[in-house]
Every structure is written in C-alpha cells, then in structure tokens.
Amino acid sequence: MQYTPFASDIELPFYIALASLKINHDKLDDSARKVLGLYELRPSDAPNASCRIQIHGNALTSDEVPSTYYRAEGMIKNVNTIEEYAKADKMGMLQQSGETIWNAINNGTIYSCPSLLSAFVILSYADLKKYKFHYWFAFPALHSDPSWTPLEEGCEGAQAHRLPSVESSALARSVQEWARVVDAPQRGFFLARRVRMRDDDTVSWKIASLSSYEDGFFKHAEFADCFTCFVDPSNYEEAPGWMLRNLLVLVKRRWGLTKVQILRYRDGPSPRDCGRSIVVTLRLKTSQLPDGGVKDDRMPKVTGWERNPSGKLTGRIVDLTEQLDPKRLADQSVDLNLKLMKWRISPNLDLEKIKGTKCLLLGAGTLGSYVARNLMAWGVRKITFVDNGSVSFSNPVRQPLFNFADCLDGGAKKAYRASQALSEIYPGVESVGHVLAVPMAGHPVLDAEKTKADFEVLKGLIDAHDVIILLMDTRESRWLPTVMGKAAGKIVMNAALGFDTFVVMRHGVTNNEHPEEELGCYFCNDVVAPMNSQKDQTLDQQCTVTRPGVAAIASALLVELLVSLLQHPLGAAAGAPQTPNNTQNDHPLGVIPHQIRGFLSTFENVSVVGRSYKCCSACSRPVIDEYKKNGWNFVQKALNEVGYVEELSGLKEVCHPPLSIA
C-alpha cells in the first residue's frame, strides 16, 4: 500500500503572526505551543498538489474550523537561534509526537479527538532582522507491522471501487447531517453502515463516530456493509492520504482487526463532487502476527519528516522580503530593537505610550534634526516641526536631515524639508512642518496681524501635542513657548548649547499641593526678563558656535530624559532625585533628573535640581495667570512694553527693591 504524504502549505499572514508572537509575547520562551492545521477536499487539484495541511494566518490563536475544512492537531516549537534549529533533536520530536498518538489509541482518548490521527509538528526559527523563516514539518505516521495490503486478485472485494451514484449521494447527505452535530475534531474520521431496505432495494446510511465501534455499531451487520471512513484529501486513485496509516494502527491495536473495509471519503458538499469516494478492503500482509497477537504493546516505528521541493529530507526557508510590501516590512522592523528590550533588559517598558506621544519640535536646525532622529528611533510616530528658516550651505554637514540639494535656489524651508526627510527615512512617521516666526520677548511687534496669526497657530499646535521641545537658536525665542506650555500643562523639554557646554532639562509643571517641590524652567535662574540677544552682535555671536559633537550629545540626552519621564506613572509631575545615586528600582529606565549640564572640556555631566522661582519671568504664577486670562493681549503687551514682564513677575522689585524711609 502506497500513501500520499501530507505537504505543508503556510499562508503569508502566519509568518507575520509568528513574528509578532515571538517579539511581543514569547520572547525568549521557546516552549512548544499549539497550532491549528486544516485540510480540505479539493477535487480540482492535480494529485501531486493534493493532501495539503494548511496553516492559516490565525492558526496560533484560533480554534475555529470553517465548515468545509477538517482539523489537524499541530504543535510548533519556535527556537531562539539558528544553531538550536540545526541541532534540535528532530528524531526525538517525531518520536514524542508519535508517542502521543500511540498513547491516545491505547487509553481511548483518541475517540474524543480523532483529529490527532492527522497530527503534525513544526520546528522553526524566525530570523526577525532579515525576515527569513526556517521551518521543517513532520507528519508522524505509526507503522503497522505486519503491514496492511489490499486483498489479492480473485478475493471478494479485492478491487478498489467507487460506490454507485445513488449510494454515494445518500452517503454524502448522511455524512453532512452527522458533521453538523459533532465537534470539529470528530469530522475527519467516522464509521458508516450501509442499510439495505428489503421492500424496494434502496440503501440508507448510518454514520457514527469512531468510538461507536466499541459500542457495537457494526454488530449483526455484514462485512460488506461496514466501512471505516476517513476524509481523504489525496487525489491519487491508488494512494490514500497519510492519516490512514495512523487509523490502521488504531484498527489493529484497538479493535483487534486483521481485515477492514476502508472508505476514502472524497465527496464534497456540491452534487458535482459526489461519486469520488473509493472503497478498498485491506488485510494484514501475513497471518504471522507478533508475539501476543494483535495486542502488541511495543510502540511502532514512527516516520514523517517532510521532504523539501527537491525531494531532500531537510527543512525549508522562506524570505518574506520578497513577498511583503516594503512599507509593511518597515512597520514590522523599525520597532524590533525596542521590543527586544522587553525580552530581558526592561520587560516593563511601555512602548505603546512612547509610540503614541505627539511631539512638537520648535526648531528644525541642528538640535531639531538630531532630536527628531532619536525620537523616531524610540518609536515616536507623530513629529511636528516649527521653524521659519531656510537651509543654507553651512547646514547639511551639521544638520543630518538636510543635504546639498536643499541649499539650492535660496534654500528649502527647514520645517517643510525636515518633515519630508523623516518620511523618506521611514514612511510610517506622521510628520508635518509649519513655517512661522515664534513671537519673541524683546522684539517689538511690527506687524500685529501677522504676529497674532503666528501666535494662534502656535497655540493650536501646543494644544494638539503632548510634548513641546524647545530647540531654537536664541534664549528669547523660548520664552513664549515656555509660558504657553506651562499654562497648557504640557511636558516641556529644553536643550541649549554653548561652545563646549550644554544644558538639557525638563520644565516643571504646576504643583498646587506642594508648590515648594515644583521644578523650575529654563528662565528660573534669570534676574531679568529675556531681551533681544541678536542686536549689535558680530558674526561669531550671531551663529551658534559649538563643538560639532555637542548638539548630538545634548539631543540624545534630551530624548532619553523624555522617554524616561514618559515611563513614570506621574509623567511630567515626576520628582527629581537630589543625588544621582538615588535610584528608583521600580522605574524601567532608572532615575529621571531635572537638568543635565554637560562639559566637554572635562567630559563630565552633572545632574542638577532647580526649583521653580516665584518671580520667574516665564513660569511664575502671576505670568501664567495673566496669560490664561488675557492671551494675545498679554503677549502683545509683553513684547512691546519694556519692563512689563519684570514688573508682573516681581523681578523688578527683586533687582530694585524700594528704599525704606527711616
């Protein structure tokens, strides 16, 4: 007897699901898990393309079997390294799977899950960096010893034959009615008893589960009317499907039979697919049974590893980069390193919170370029730029989002080009640029209508984002966003550069319960309000002259500080440790300083805590309250009237206290 081996047929979405499961759930756990296999009757397929076990995209999570499919019980072991895949005990895996079938036959549990007779195992390794999947299927088949063979020529029932069309149609109807009322694991294997009507020579069928054999389902019936059936996906006329091998072991071991009439059920639900089922009578090849007769307790030999398309006994490799849309590949790959952090190093890291954070970058120059790239590396998807400058020829070597072509024809607008560059790096990012001038303290309003329009756009952007990042060239340009961010309760991050120094900080948020613990802002150490720093400046004073590496260092620290802050349950309200050694063991990324001041001349970083100053020109309560109350009118007055902000905040009184009269 020749059998048609199962062939594996994996849908593309399954690989995506397996990769996602490995990255997000299993991580380093390579324990075997269940996987649902399906097979179906496909009469139109060529014989060599039939008998396929299909692995659908939901095979790892779903237990549902569509009505026209039949269930196969599978296990998958997805190992962690290619070396483990190569060195895995493949014979041991096959033997263990075969032993599961053998034990189920012996103890009778096979009757509750006959689909175990179509069991399979998968050994796999997913190379998630290159999106290559290595896998090898095994379809364990227990050998019958002695083997089964069709009856010799001349014996009654020797020839394999099809049922008459009337009987075949009646059988199909009976099987379909039975299948509707039994569980999915039962549908692939069953018993059929032909009942001949004495009055009119018609035939009807009784269908039952395999367990009914031991309840006397065939009692008093003629051998010719008793059929042990299995749904056969093989389209070969003389080579039944692979699962028959395990069914015959059950017939011999459990029922003690040496002769059986097998019905290869191949009739589909459509009338045009009826009449394809084949009946074959089998007997054990020799009457010389092993010691102990049919009840031989020794486990049979097991075979079943699948051959590759070249006929070699080895696994297969599928390269998804050749099949997936490049944008989808990018979506799957950009977060890979981040998700690997959760495997061992930081399992409590909340990547979704980082991914969903909307960041507004005020400044698209050197700092803005580096900060944007680091935000993308952490998985941030929403990045908005605000800048009113154009790309000059001196920019591309220091600002990695721009190139030489951006300098031509007067230079592209930095905000627009920066957002476009991010989309070129990763199409999944949502980035836009806005060209506008941020109203600056110390710079009187020359065009009230335009300045107000810029203010309204800036206000809308701040309201629409979670994090405001100050990366502008001048001190005074940071004043208004500091006020607006504090009033809106946003996370405000700030980075500023000197020649070989930098400061990176997070601004404090309002703390009504403990105002003495409120953290300060960029302006809390000032004793005067911001003024025009560009007036009467030489060229070296107009440009930001720094050691080239300072911007990259400061930008990286700013993003790392922001991400650490996002992981804290209090968010922007998180306190700052007084000393660097004051670690927070429950935080996935460690301490969250208030300020980091760096000195490249000594290659030192110092963490500093600065409290909110009650007379601060930007974050003091009088300034914030006045802004909330009067909005644009307050801004216009602050820009036009010299000394107004100092007087409102209390700085004027600090610098020039009233003389006491003796």
UniProtKB/Swiss-Prot annotation:
**GO biological process: one example:** cellular response to nitrogen starvation
A Gene Ontology CC term for this entry?
A: cytoplasm
Q: Where on this chain is GXGXXG motif (motif)?
A: 363-368
From which domain of life does this come? Eukaryota
InterPro entries hit by this protein: Atg7, Atg7_N, Atg7_N_1, Atg7_N_2, ThiF/MoeB/HesA, ThiF_NAD_FAD-bd, Ubiquitin-activating_enz
* Recorded family membership: Belongs to the ATG7 family.
This chain's protein is named Ubiquitin-like modifier-activating enzyme atg7
Q: Which organism is it from?
A: Emericella nidulans (strain FGSC A4 / ATCC 38163 / CBS 112.46 / NRRL 194 / M139) (Aspergillus nidulans)
Q: What is the lineage of its organism?
A: Eukaryota, Fungi, Dikarya, Ascomycota, Pezizomycotina
